A protein has these predicted regions:
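Short secondary-structure boundary segments
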Residues: 125
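An alpha-helical appendage that flanks or caps ligand/catalytic pockets
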Residues: 3-112
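C-terminal helical cap(s) of enzyme catalytic domains, especially alpha/beta-barrels
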Residues: 1-4, 130-153
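Positions that flank functional sites
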Residues: 20, 128-129
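Structural motif
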Residues: 116-117
């Protein structure tokens, strides 16, 4: 990133390495697994580029040239089509796309990003994708625990 900034005539020291990542968390690995294997989480995978799908051994249902969410036109997809597209989404793809696990797991994953130069993380709670509204709302507690832990990194 710093090389690209320098090549573009920008001061590389003025660039803050940042990323926007979704978090799937819960009080147990079972809660995390329930969320990440939900239809809603799998539908989110349609936003991921074909290249990322291919790295997990599957073809993106919208084609090999699909570059991500900016190419997705959701109003052209009906429910049966989406359900057919997501039936083969590998959980490994979702685990690669999200920070996942218990609060301690997610904080450890964020620390790896920090150790590779990240200085600003925008964490979004995707744990609300759980099939149960009650459990979706309850996911805020471990997510807030993560936010408190991230402040200490």
């Amino acid at each position: 990133m710093k090389t690209a900034a320098s090549d573009a005539g920008r001061d590389p020291t003025c660039i803050t390495p940042a990323v926007w990542l979704f978090v799937v968390t819960g009080r147990s690995q079972q809660e995390v697994a329930e969320t990440i294997s939900s239809e809603a989480a799998k539908a989110f995978a349609l936003n991921l580029p074909a290249e990322m799908w291919a790295s997990h051994g599957v073809q993106h249902p919208l084609g090999d040239d699909f570059s991500g969410g900016q190419d997705l036109v959701p109003q052209t997809l009906d429910e049966p089509t989406v359900l057919s597209y997501i039936k083969d989404v590998p959980l490994s793809l979702l685990k690669d796309a999200f920070l996942t696990g218990t609060p301690d797991d997610v904080i450890d994953q964020a620390a790896e990003w920090r150790d590779h130069g990240l200085r600003y993380l925008v964490a979004r709670n995707a744990s609300i994708l759980r099939p149960s509204l009650r459990k979706s709302l309850a996911s805020n507690a471990p997510f807030f625990e993560i936010l408190r832990g991230l402040k200490k990194l």
